[in-house]
Amino acid sequence: MGRNCGWLTAATAQEYRSRLKNRKFLPSFLISKERWDIDAVYIPEIKINIKAESRRLKKRMDEKDSVNIFLSEGAGIESIVSELESSGQQVLRDAFGHVRLDEINPGQWFAKHFSKEINSDKVLVQKSGYFARSAKPNKKDLDLIFQSTDMAVSCALNGQSGVVGIDEDQDQLQC
């Protein structure tokens, strides 16, 4: 969700880790926090050194027998495109010249690549886009929605046009 924007993946990973603190684990049954924890978060804003990550994840796999990765859909695109094109495959692009992410499927590419590099027998890729787009809004979402609409109406009634959103520097709603 967001070709070049990893904030949702990063925020989801942060929320996931905070929820792990409240879970009960049974290490004697191989159900430990470490096995459920995140080993990597890949977002488009940060370049991924695939070779170095493969080595790091192999080490994690050897230590805990599993690897959990949160991947933003636009992460690592340059590496994927480079590999595909160097092997003679055509990379399809949309009318704007953007790589068609649904065609190259970054999640599957990373799964295939890393499973080979870390000697994993099983791989599970869960694409959150469908769940995120269809999820019921939580209280935090609803509060932001109502605050945004209240501000938008207030600005419109005062003759002020623009876009309503949270100012990242001041962490407040602005128009």
State where each predicted segment sits.
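C-terminal non-catalytic interaction/assembly regions of soluble proteins
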Residues: 83-175
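Accessory alpha-helical/coil subdomains and C-terminal extensions
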Residues: 1-121
